[in-house]
Amino acid sequence: MARTTPIARYRNIGISAHIDAGKTTTTERILFYTGVNHKIGEVHDGAATMDWMEQEQERGITITSAATTAFWSGMAKQYEPHRINIIDTPGHVDFTIEVERSMRVLDGAVMVYCAVGGVQPQSETVWRQANKYKVPRIAFVNKMDRMGANFLKVVNQIKTRLGANPVPLQLAIGAEEHFTGVVDLVKMKAINWNDADQGVTFEYEDIPADMVELANEWHQNLIESAAEASEELMEKYLGGEELTEEEIKGALRQRVLNNEIILVTCGSAFKNKGVQAMLDAVIDYLPSPVDVPAINGILDDGKDTPAERHASDDEPFSALAFKIATDPFVGNLTFFRVYSGVVNSGDTVLNSVKAARERFGRIVQMHANKREEIKEVRAGDIAAAIGLKDVTTGDTLCDPDAPIILERMEFPEPVISIAVEPKTKADQEKMGLALGRLAKEDPSFRVWTDEESNQTIIAGMGELHLDIIVDRMKREFNVEANVGKPQVAYRETIRQKVTDVEGKHAKQSGGRGQYGHVVIDMYPLEPGSNPKGYEFINDIKGGVIPGEYIPAVDKGIQEQLKAGPLAGYPVVDMGIRLHFGSYHDVDSSELAFKLAASIAFKEGFKKAKPVLLEPIMKVEVETPEENTGDVIGDLSRRRGMLKGQESEVTGVKIHAEVPLSEMFGYATQLRSLTKGRASYTMEFLKYDEAPSNVAQAVIEARGK
């Protein structure tokens, strides 16, 4: 099969927003105008197409980023058909992992803001993630029909709160119930959408007389921004020459692709105004797969040689699995983004991260949760594969004859855990199966069995994250569970280097004995300096311990790291240097050296000033001014460190760093302090040493 859409006419975009900015309605309208979806789904009555899990429809928040394909030829049919692949991203802080995951595979993004609420704390988190992956973006200021809507105020917040350089492409004509359309600042015309056909058709009209002066001022601002793209254009502009529409658009596109400016559009998705022009801006200004740098990877040659893949059908096949979803009809769906080459259903590919081969059984393209089966996918495509056996989020799929590992995704460690048990014994096996599937879908969610209590423990990024997991078990797998009290994921580490710690395991009473003897140094590592949080250096000279036993020493220590001597929590940021020891020709074995290493580890750990680390959360509270004192007082009682506050239109925004252990039940307390008028967001920031009284209480509670 030949390629149907040239790759330069692809746009792989994400639509990202704070909860309640109207992102779901915006996506729905995109599907409507691109002709995929003929009845507009409203999130107000739970019928939206993109939000395909029951839960999302009930809570009105988007949890899983579904990928949808749509085609657009422009409001005035001015382009050849462009293929837009939309990755829907969640807006709640407990799901930032989903956002991060989708940012990896996007080429561009549309940031949706509410014209009333403006830039919210969650918008800042998403913004940082987009910066991290250098994603070019444009903004859409939605809900211009709401009370208190103010387009230019939001433009200013994009500048002050996000540190970006916003350039309006449009101005709103009227606001609140008087919002009727937009001024196109490139064409210098008003756009008036036809209410009778839900905004499918439109007219260009003259700019309203009372807006001409303002429009000229912002048109000038737009032209200046365009002129800064090159010296040539700047000279032309300064020489008093008019820039053509092509020159303006080309220059603005260049600056968006370089992440120098954010073009801002506006509208009301609910009132069918503005989404159409925003789609034109996606085509005009956001990158195709060939406009972004080639993806980097490493060759599977044992030397980690850097390599790259360009967005071309002629290069070897390479793709990144960015999401695993469980589908009620077909089982596992693996969403993947193709960076290079072509793959057909029935082909065998290599999962280079796991060094395993996988066969592409069926390939489907998703439209929200409806699917269309396709035979092949090419560079730039986003699709889902059915029937892959052992693929996890972040794995690379590639041509077995040209193996490459694309940049790995990094996922944060969970910070909160709870014990779960099925309400009936009969559900035990079903629960294990359900949790296993959910953990495969979501790398920021973990599940394990506590060896001492034999309880099943689930861990995630926040209380809401775990609530939703428990809820999904009930809905999708029909397993009802009782949930324990949330537990904090503490860590242990050392603060001091200790040298020449000896560990000896010797049993030589008749018959074959056991003998292993090691001497190690232990030392603290800079937090975050080693992604594993542990390093092992083999410094054995002259074969005092034979090479075949060295991995056993490393393994013996790694097993001890899982449950530290202090309170049984994982040990992090620690290095081991093995530099001496002895062995016995007959009695030495791997097991003996493993045991010797664990004896040395326990001995050394006690002497190395062990400390307990606790997760610290970055907390932002928005509260009415009159409650500021109460909120700050309450955060201080929770051992919070105040990091600053600023005045907002809606009240005061307080920034603090608070230990997670003190944040349980905070939502309820904040509601009662402020009569429900305050809101807060919380995300993991870092691990820090717990004060001795807190550490003591934790250690005693663990019975150590």
UniProtKB/Swiss-Prot annotation:
Annotated organism of origin: Escherichia coli O17:K52:H18 (strain UMN026 / ExPEC)
Location of the tr-type G domain: 8-290
CDD domains tied to this protein: EF-G, EFG_III, EFG_mtEFG1_IV, EFG_mtEFG_C, EFG_mtEFG_II
One of the record's GO molecular function terms: GTPase activity
Official protein name in the record: Elongation factor G
Role: Catalyzes the GTP-dependent ribosomal translocation step during translation elongation. During this step, the ribosome changes from the pre-translocational (PRE) to the post-translocational (POST) state as the newly formed A-site-bound peptidyl-tRNA and P-site-bound deacylated tRNA move to the P and E sites, respectively. Catalyzes the coordinated movement of the two tRNA molecules, the mRNA and conformational changes in the ribosome.
GO terms classed as biological process: ribosome disassembly
Superkingdom in the source lineage: Bacteria
Keyword Lipoprotein among UniProt keywords: no
Compartment(s): Cytoplasm
Cited Gene3D superfamilies: 3.30.230.10, 3.30.70.240, Elongation Factor G (Translational Gtpase), domain 3 (3.30.70.870), P-loop containing nucleotide triphosphate hydrolases (3.40.50.300), Translation factors (2.40.30.10)
Keyword Transport: no
Family stated for the protein in its record: Belongs to the TRAFAC class translation factor GTPase superfamily. Classic translation factor GTPase family. EF-G/EF-2 subfamily.
Entry keyword set: Acetylation, Cytoplasm, Elongation factor, GTP-binding, Nucleotide-binding, Protein biosynthesis
PROSITE patterns: G_TR_1 (PS00301), G_TR_2 (PS51722)
HAMAP family hit by this protein: EF_G_EF_2_B
Binding site for GTP: 17-24, 88-92, 142-145
Modified residues (N6-acetyllysine): 504, 643
One cellular component (GO) term of this entry: cytoplasm
Record gene name: fusA
SMART domains the record matches: EFG_C (SM00838), EFG_IV (SM00889)
Short name of any one Pfam family annotated for the protein: EFG_C
